[in-house]
A protein has these predicted regions:
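Peripheral (often C-terminal) accessory segments that flank ATP-dependent C-N-forming ligase machineries
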Residues: 230-340
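Active-site nucleotide/adenylate-binding loops and adjacent lid/helix of ATP-dependent enzymes
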Residues: 33-113, 119, 131, 160-176, ...
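Glycine-rich phosphate/pyrophosphate-binding beta-alpha loops
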Residues: 84, 205-221, 285
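Short, flexible turn/loop "capping" segments at secondary-structure junctions
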Residues: 76-80, 150-151, 292-297
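Conserved N-proximal alpha/beta basic substrate-recognition cap immediately N-terminal to
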Residues: 1-56, 65, 298
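Phosphate-binding core of ATP-grasp and ATP-grasp-like enzymes
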Residues: 103-111, 116-160, 168-201, 205-213, ...
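Short, well-ordered beta-strand elements within core beta-sheets of diverse protein domains
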Residues: 88, 116, 159, 218, ...
Length: 340
């Protein structure tokens, strides 16, 4: 079997292999649709999915015309990247050319997507599809950070509190997106906007989300989500039955500045872990880190069993005190950044 988690990089390859080798997994055509935001937009439109209006463009001039037609603000997107890369929110015409170049650079396509900017609350929705039907649905709160070009997801929380009517509409729109894309025998992850009981599916991936989502699903629902993904890929029977309900949340460890990790207080890190904190550090001392621009700039993560963001943030501060960038404590660096 073959599957992936948290990235679109391998999804098309997985679809191709599953098709050629008759394995359990995402169909190749669905994989191609769900790794190209423009193709996805076309499929959603044809499938009646509630989504933002958008247009495919091949030049800055076409992007300008599309933005004028859609009405500002718009979002200019690289069509073949995930993790908020190549995405810019554009407020006026003077920003279009730079946004277009940001989207085109690093893309294997000769077009980008210009999309109407939606207002509302951004949430995440993960699920699992079997026999073309959603058999598991997990909406969750999304923590975002406003980057240079767009908002960047930096964490998630379970459960997402909402009315029964809103949950039903989320499920309905997700199923429409699944049907429109042809996704099957795979996990899905969607960026969703809600306003009252109105739901828009911004985009959907044919794999589970990143930023600790599988770990949080496992913690909240009481089953190992990674195990169920692997079982599905192997063609084995899966079980998404919730066995417990443990509120939990996570955030990425990030740096607002580029530099080198000069010190990690390993003794304190171990004490925090012994207290029950789920703490992962990606890099050792001496490793260079980048100022956060998207989720790939993470230097670790923290998971806490709580329903209070303030409690998570306090634990994040304790971890940041353990890390030094270019001789300065990371908690201090963040305090100086937010004070500006």
């Amino acid at each position: 079997g073959i599957c992936t988690s948290g990235t679109d990089v391998a999804v098309s390859t997985i679809g191709y292999i599953c098709e050629k080798m008759h394995l359990s997994g995402i169909p190749y055509e669905a994989a191609k649709i769900l790794t190209d935001k423009a193709k996805m937009k076309d499929a959603f439109r044809q499938g009646g999915v509630s989504a933002a209006d958008g247009m495919r463009v091949r030049s800055a001039e076409e992007a300008q015309k599309a933005a004028e037609q859609l009405g500002y603000p718009v979002v200019v997107k690289r069509v073949d990247s995930s993790g908020s890369r190549g995405i810019t929110v554009v407020e006026h015409s003077g920003q279009i050319e730079e946004a277009y170049e940001n989207a085109r650079n690093g893309s294997a396509r000769d077009y980008v997507l210009v999309e109407k900017f939606l207002r509302g609350t951004e949430i995440g929705v993960d699920g699992f599809v079997q026999n073309h039907k959603l058999v598991f649905l997990a909406p969750h709160t999304k923590f975002v950070y406003r980057g240079a070009h767009t908002t960047v997801p930096v964490g998630h929380a379970f459960p997402y509190g909402c009315s029964g009517a809103l949950r039903e509409e989320i499920a309905r729109q997700m199923q429409l997106a699944v049907t429109a894309s042809g996704a099957d025998q795979c996990s899905v992850n969607a960026d969703v906007f809600v306003d009252g009981e109105k739901v828009w599916i911004i985009e959907m991936g044919g794999r589970t989300g990143a930023t600790c989502i599988p770990e949080l699903i496992s913690t909240y629902y009481g089953f190992d989500f990674y195990e169920q993904m692997i079982k599905s890929a192997l063609g084995e029977e899966t079980d998404f039955q919730q066995t417990e309900s443990c509120p939990c949340m996570a955030k990425l460890l990030l740096s607002p500045v580029s530099g080198t990790i000069t010190q990690i207080d390993r003794d304190q890190v171990e004490r925090l872990r012994q207290e029950g904190l789920e703490l992962v550090l990606d890099y050792p001392e001496g490793h260079e880190v980048s100022a956060m621009a998207d989720g790939t700039d993470r230097i670790g993560h923290v998971i806490v069993k709580t329903d209070r963001e303030a409690e998570l943030d306090e634990q994040m501060k304790r971890v940041y005190r353990c890390i030094w960038i270019d001789g300065k404590n990371l908690e201090t660096i963040w305090e100086e950044k937010t004070a500006k």
